[in-house]
């Protein structure tokens, strides 16, 4: 007996036992009713007929059994009344305006132990504009379950949703049947013999009738041996006519061919027939068009199997011309020729790179924006082309050409056993899905609109985990793990045998302001609402469609202020909704409002308006969303967070007059799972496509709406996160997941004109019992998968937010962990991710569509693929931001930068004004298929990065604890031009636009009061020629400004301003350990007097304690001396600098920004003379206070050999050429060092070291004396000419070398800029090859030239975008 048979037997046995119990024990009636409610003998058959004016009241103990379809005005079940639906073969449709169940009333269709097996539909009808007075609580078109009411809907047990287990390709080509394709190397006549009963290939063979006449004889013998009735598929690949004899030609003619008799050289020819039935033949033939022209002969024929199913045989014999785009060519001149650019001119400029007759031309701006092109023809050939930018001739642009390759042969045989149908291979047993059921397959690309619906067909040959569906997929739907990430498409069941649906009009009508401006369809559907005190609510196996209204409170399923609905509320069994499909809804899917403990399990929400799974006011807790699927979630009009940009701008009735909408800030937040309280459980859920976000945890500082007062302010921001594991998010625009932001909990006013519940700022910091004075309790996110989200895989702001064993792939930005722009909101907390995988560009390339604007090259193979945002968008794995962050034991895979697209595994937030913590730690990182040049990118001015001149852009830094990123354990990686953290031994990484340094680092947080438009200049005393300019993080409309540079400890600094110095200033010591110090000189106008004190500020308790004062000293040395409560400042009025030593006095926790006692601050009040000028003391400060640059913390040794985990690695290159002064003598000093091995120079002139760019080995080193450089420079030219391509060439001068003359042109050949002028000292890293790497560097100065940098090995040219 099969599984289904056993289930039927057990079900019948249970019913038999129930009836025996009823017969022997009459008191057991209630037990039977609970098992199969329609079998109770108390029920009275009821058939009210069809009367739209009939107001039905079922009460006073009436128990009715609805046995047939009916139409009534309304139904009210109360006072112990009960309506039960008869379970039999005849479908029952109950059509009514509304159903109200309260005061002991009950409605039953099936039960948990006896699921309803027939078909039952409730249709809620009516328009909003009929003049009918809506119920003040329930409205119109509803099923209302009030106090004492019970609603029990229990449909058939069916699998709710599962995963695709085999990839579906567009058109279904790879889903069953047979596919055969050959090109070169498979010449001749190809024959397939096909069984007409099943469509399977019985045998196939190849006959090389080009090579030998014996092959013709063998072909005839083969065809004669095939029994009549078999299907023959015959075609030529490449060439088959040269030794094709008459016997073979006649044999094919006998089978029904008309063209084989005259087959010529390389003619494409295809033929299908049934042996013994020449009239069944189909045939195609075409002559060969030469090596530059495509030609194809194609046939197909439909056959029917013995089971009545159809299969299609397709056959093609072709000469195919493949095409490819050339590289991009930069063009920076406006055409001076009338009629456009001559293509011949480009041929000359780029010989061998452009074909003679391009098929197509593309042009873009230098930033990648598409431009219009026009091809002008002359005598049938491409003669000129013109480029236009908004109607004008382009000035500076890039152009490329589509060129055809020589043709190649191609033979294809396809047998499609699923004609206009597709077999789905699924993870689970889906035998509960029946013919006629509707399924939806989720998108596995960036666009959620690639979700597709299919109808199940009968399939006798399907396995238990297979179904046949009508039609073919339009899009690629992944059904496998790709690059370590489970990207399988979700497949949801939409059909159920119990249906609750709204009756809809054909088009939109204006029952609410603006509604028809946004929707062209009727959105006034039905809804189900549960009120406080309902008796029971259990819904399963039910389909809800056309439900919800664009009115607040009218949702498909709505638990409204119901309180505790589980055991805590006295419900046994606890309330649940499970195994539901809620689709094509007009306002959400499931709303939990002021209700706790609800189980929402195995629910599919599809094609909804507004947040799908929605918690409303903030106090909703302990609800569990288990194995729920939401997809195709679109914007709605109800709340600002539901609205898209158009709605946000048009719907302003709930705002204060004068409000100017900012859609991306105030609105644009529609989400599949909208969690207004973190203390809810999300397990095994999938957010498979929303206009904005998959999972969004949002915070209500105080409860809103009717829930006002249910918790104290700030409770939701501190409550620990419920269970969150095994969830997945993809095909969303903004993010797969967000923990951040709040909603505005006050009405619109003159002070804040934004509408109630607009999106605002909020911070999450989970603590035990939601008490910030109790220990922190981290929010744990485990086994989360985020892929194909256009912007972010996840944006998570904390507090302690920790991720473990997560997977991110194909997101614009995989993950951003944020804390606070100035401080972590919860000081001492951290954000962490460990044991996780990030994939930049996976094997899921998506589907190219005609209107897909974001398609372009990518991945390791540079093939076409869908892209997240723009062709040149800098894809990033983890975006470092704020801090402190810990990244541990993570793997990065397939991040490959292109020339024009700065893809990287690790990077920083773009256009960042905020702080960057030097204690952002990275350890245990592994890279797979990530070139070492693409591991990190600090940014550069250009598209997406803009000018890279915001404060956070300039101060980016992180700690490479074990060297797994940089190969330098314990190093700090920083932007290459941040001289506040650099020292003389830092090593540049040009590919990253960064530097590898060592040291002890912290931050200063400087607040300048009563001003917001000052630009601050800070200088480290040992590098006075390299200031750092900070604009301030805040807008110019604030009453103060703040600056937060990362600084090297135990160093001296000066601070200057572009206007008069601020009269009030506070300096906070951030990330200082006890005893850490810096010395600061602040520029003020002469005549200024000061009042300076120190204090400790406890941000949590908002308490400040004064700890001391600074008194003036006339001796600079005394600044170094301090005593408890008393320190010194030195006012050097000549230079205009106020000197202070800032030293931390208290211990600090590991991840805290401030000490355990609070934040240590120094406050300065300055009485500044009126009309004082600009406070920039640089000219008087230096060289007076210049300090010698020293390395306090030695650079770590680079990892080598077996310590490295990847084949590519960095080669360390150090070069110095300088004059060193010893007493009264000057000594010339020069050397080249490669990976720790020095090559000193002994003679004046040029030293040269050549390195193999593939292996990183030094292959030669020599020197050229001045006499050679000056007299016989061709020796150097000849030497360079013999250097193999792909070689790194290092050069350093020594002594008074010849810095001018013909020999310097060698530098240009090795990548130096043309027209260079050398000074007295020179160091150069060059490259001999066909391209110029970014790391080619020339340093030339009068006294010292120095290059410390790394070069990637092997040297590989980046592919162009």
From Swiss-Prot:
Expressed in dermal and in synovial fibroblasts. Strongly expressed in gastric cancers compared with the paired normal tissues. Strongly expressed in both ductal carcinoma and invasive breast cancer cells compared with benign epithelial cells (at protein level). Strongly expressed in brain, placenta, prostate, breast, lung and testis. Expressed in fibroblasts, epithelial cells and cancer cells. In ear, it is specifically expressed in inner ear. Expressed in cochlea and vestibule tissues. Strongly expressed in gastric cancers compared with the paired normal tissues. One of its GO terms (cellular component) is nuclear membrane. Residues 44-166 form the G8 domain. Activity is up-regulated by histamine. Its main location: nucleus. PbH1 repeats lie at residues 572-594, 595-617, 719-741, 798-819. N-glycosylated; glycosylation is not necessary for HA-binding. CDD domains: PANDER_like_KIAA1199, PANDER_like_TMEM2. InterPro entries: CEMIP/CEMIP2 (IPR052252), CEMIP_beta-hel_dom (IPR055401), CEMIP_X (IPR055400), G8_domain (IPR019316), ILEI/PANDER_dom (IPR039477), Pectin_lyase_fold/virulence (IPR011050), TMEM2_PANDER-like (IPR039473), WxxW_domain (IPR025155). Its EC number is 3.2.1.35. This is Cell migration-inducing and hyaluronan-binding protein.
């Amino acid at each position: 007996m099969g599984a289904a048979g056993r289930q039927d037997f057990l079900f019948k046995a249970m019913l038999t036992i129930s009836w025996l119990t009823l017969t022997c024990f009459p008191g057991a009636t209630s037990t039977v009713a609970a098992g199969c409610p329609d079998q109770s003998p108390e029920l009275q058959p009821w058939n009210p007929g069809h009367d739209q004016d009939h107001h039905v009241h079922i009460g006073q103990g009436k128990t009715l059994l609805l046995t047939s379809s009916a139409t009534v005005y309304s139904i009210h079940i109360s006072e112990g009344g009960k309506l039960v639906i008869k379970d039999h073969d005849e479908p029952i449709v109950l059509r009514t305006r509304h159903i109200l169940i309260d005061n002991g009333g009950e409605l039953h269709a099936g039960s948990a132990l006896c699921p309803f097996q027939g078909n039952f539909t409730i249709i809620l009808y009516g328009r909003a504009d009929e003049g009918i007075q809506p119920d003040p609580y329930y409205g119109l078109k509803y099923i209302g379950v009030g106090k004492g009411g019970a609603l029990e809907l229990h449909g058939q047990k069916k699998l709710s949703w599962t995963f695709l287990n085999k990839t579906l390709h567009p058109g279904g080509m790879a889903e069953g049947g047979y596919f055969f394709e050959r090109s070169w190397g498979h010449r001749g006549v190809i024959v397939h013999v096909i069984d007409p009963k099943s469509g399977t290939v019985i045998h196939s063979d190849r006959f090389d009738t080009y090579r030998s006449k014996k092959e013709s004889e063998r072909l005839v013998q083969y065809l004669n041996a095939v029994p009549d009735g078999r299907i023959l598929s015959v075609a030529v690949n490449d060439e088959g006519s040269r030794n094709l004899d008459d016997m073979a030609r006649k044999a094919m003619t006998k089978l029904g061919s008309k063209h084989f008799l005259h087959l010529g050289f390389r003619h494409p020819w295809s033929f299908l027939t049934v042996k013994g039935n020449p009239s069944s033949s189909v045939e195609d033939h075409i002559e060969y068009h030469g090596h530059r022209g495509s030609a194809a002969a194609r046939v197909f024929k439909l056959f029917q199997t013995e089971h009545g199913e159809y299969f299609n045989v397709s056959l093609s014999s072709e000469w195919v011309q493949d095409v490819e785009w050339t590289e991009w060519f930069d063009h920076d001149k406006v055409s001076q020729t009338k009629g456009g650019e001559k293509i011949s001119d480009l041929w000359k400029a780029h010989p061998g790179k452009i074909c003679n007759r391009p098929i197509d031309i593309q042009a873009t701006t230098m930033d990648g924006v598409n431009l219009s092109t026009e091809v002008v023809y002359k005598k049938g050939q491409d003669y000129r082309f013109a480029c236009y930018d908004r109607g004008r001739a382009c000035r500076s642009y890039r152009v490329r050409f589509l060129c055809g390759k020589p043709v190649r042969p191609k033979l294809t045989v396809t047998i499609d056993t699923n004609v206009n149908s597709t077999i789905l291979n699924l993870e689970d047993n889906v035998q509960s899905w029946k013919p006629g059921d509707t399924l939806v397959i989720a998108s596995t690309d960036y666009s959620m609109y690639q979700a597709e619906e299919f109808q199940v067909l009968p399939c006798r040959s399907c396995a238990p985990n297979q179904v046949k569906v009508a039609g073919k997929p339009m899009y690629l739907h992944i059904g496998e793990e790709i690059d370590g990430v489970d990207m399988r498409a979700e497949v949801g069941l939409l059909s159920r045998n119990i249906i609750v649906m709204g009756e809809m009009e054909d088009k939109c009508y204006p029952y609410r302001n603006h509604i028809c401006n946004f929707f062209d369809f009727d959105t006034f559907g039905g809804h189900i609402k549960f009120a406080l005190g309902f008796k029971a609510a259990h819904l399963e196996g039910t389909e809800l469609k056309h439900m919800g209204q664009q009115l607040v409170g009218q949702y498909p399923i709505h638990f409204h202020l119901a309180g505790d609905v589980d055991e805590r509320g006295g419900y046994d069994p606890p309330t649940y909704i499970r195994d539901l499909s809620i689709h094509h809804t007009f306002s959400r899917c499931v709303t939990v409002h002021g209700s706790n403990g609800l189980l929402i399990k195995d629910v599919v929400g599809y094609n909804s308006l507004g947040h799908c799974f929605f918690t409303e006011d903030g106090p909703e807790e302990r609800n569990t969303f288990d194995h729920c699927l939401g997809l195709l979630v679109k914007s709605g009009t109800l709340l600002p967070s539901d609205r898209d940009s158009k709605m946000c701008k048009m719907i302003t009735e709930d705002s204060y007059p004068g409000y100017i909408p900012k859609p991306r800030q105030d609105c644009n937040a529609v989400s599949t799972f909208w969690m207004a309280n973190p203390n809810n459980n999300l397990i095994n859920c999938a957010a498979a496509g929303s206009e904005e976000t998959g999972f969004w945890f949002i915070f209500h500082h105080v409860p809103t709406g009717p829930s006002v007062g249910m918790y104290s302010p700030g409770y939701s921001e501190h409550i620990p996160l419920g269970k969150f594991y095994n969830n997945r998010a993809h095909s969303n625009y903004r993010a797969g997941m967000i923990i951040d932001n709040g909603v505005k909990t006050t009405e619109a006013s003159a002070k804040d004109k934004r509408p109630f519940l607009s999106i605002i700022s909020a911070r999450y910091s989970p603590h035990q019992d939601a008490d910030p004075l109790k220990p922190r309790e981290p929010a744990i996110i485990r086994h989360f998968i985020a892929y194909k989200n256009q912007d972010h895989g996840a944006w998570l702001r904390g507090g302690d937010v920790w991720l473990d064993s997560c997977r991110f792939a194909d997101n614009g930005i995989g993950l951003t962990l944020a804390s606070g722009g100035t401080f972590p909101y919860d000081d001492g907390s951290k954000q962490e991710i460990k044991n996780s995988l990030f994939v930049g560009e996976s094997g899921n390339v998506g589907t190219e569509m005609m209107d897909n604007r974001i398609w372009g090259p990518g991945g390791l193979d540079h093939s076409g693929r869908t892209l997240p945002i723009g062709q040149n968008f800098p894809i990033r794995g983890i975006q470092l931001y704020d801090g402190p962050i810990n990244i541990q034991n993570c793997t990065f895979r397939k991040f490959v930068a292109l020339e024009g697209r700065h893809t990287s595994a690790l990077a920083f937030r773009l256009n960042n004004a905020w702080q960057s913590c030097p204690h952002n730690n990275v350890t245990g990182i592994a890279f797979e298929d990530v070139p070492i040049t693409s591991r990190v990118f600090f940014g550069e001015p250009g598209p997406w990065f803009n000018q890279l001149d915001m404060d956070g852009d300039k101060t980016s830094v992180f700690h490479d604890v074990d060297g797994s990123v940089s190969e330098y354990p314990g190093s700090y990686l920083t932007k290459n031009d941040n001289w506040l953290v650099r020292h003389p031994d830092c090593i540049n990484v040009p590919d990253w636009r960064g530097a590898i340094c060592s040291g002890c680092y912290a931050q200063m947080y400087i607040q300048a009061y009563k001003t917001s438009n000052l630009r601050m200049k800070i200088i480290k005393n040992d590098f006075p020629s390299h200031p750092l300019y900070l604009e301030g993080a805040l807008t110019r409309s604030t009453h103060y400004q703040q600056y937060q540079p990362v600084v090297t400890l135990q160093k001296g600094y000066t601070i200057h301003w572009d206007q008069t110095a601020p009269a009030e200033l506070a300096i906070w010591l951030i990330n200082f350990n006890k005893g850490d110090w810096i010395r600061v000189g602040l520029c003020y106008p002469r005549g200024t007097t000061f009042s300076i004190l120190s204090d400790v500020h406890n941000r949590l308790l908002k308490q400040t304690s004064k700890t001391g004062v600074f008194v003036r000293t006339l001796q600079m040395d005394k600044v170094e001396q301090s005593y408890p409560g008393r320190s010194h400042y030195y006012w050097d009025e000549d230079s205009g600098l106020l000197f202070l030593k800032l030293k931390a006095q208290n211990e600090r926790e590991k991840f805290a920004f401030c000490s355990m006692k609070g934040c240590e601050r120094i406050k300065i009040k300055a009485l500044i003379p009126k009309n004082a000028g600009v406070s920039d003391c640089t000219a008087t400060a230096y060289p007076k206070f210049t300090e010698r640059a020293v390395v306090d913390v030695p650079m770590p040794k680079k990892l080598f050999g077996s310590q490295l985990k990847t084949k590519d690695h960095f080669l360390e290159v150090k070069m110095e050429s300088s004059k060193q002064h010893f007493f009264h003598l000057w000594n010339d000093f020069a050397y080249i060092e490669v990976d720790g091995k020095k090559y000193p120079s002994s003679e004046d002139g040029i030293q040269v070291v050549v390195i193999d760019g593939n292996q990183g080995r030094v292959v030669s080193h020599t020197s050229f004396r001045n006499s050679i450089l000056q007299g016989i420079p061709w020796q150097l030219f000849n030497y360079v000419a013999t250097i193999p391509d792909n070689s790194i060439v290092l050069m350093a001068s020594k002594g008074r070398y010849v810095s001018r003359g013909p020999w310097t042109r060698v530098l240009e050949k090795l990548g130096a800029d043309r027209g260079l002028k050398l000074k007295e000292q020179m160091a150069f890293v060059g490259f001999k090859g066909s391209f110029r790497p970014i790391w080619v560097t020339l340093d030339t100065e009068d006294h010292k030239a120095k290059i410390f940098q790394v070069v990637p090995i092997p040297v590989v040219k980046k592919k162009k975008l």
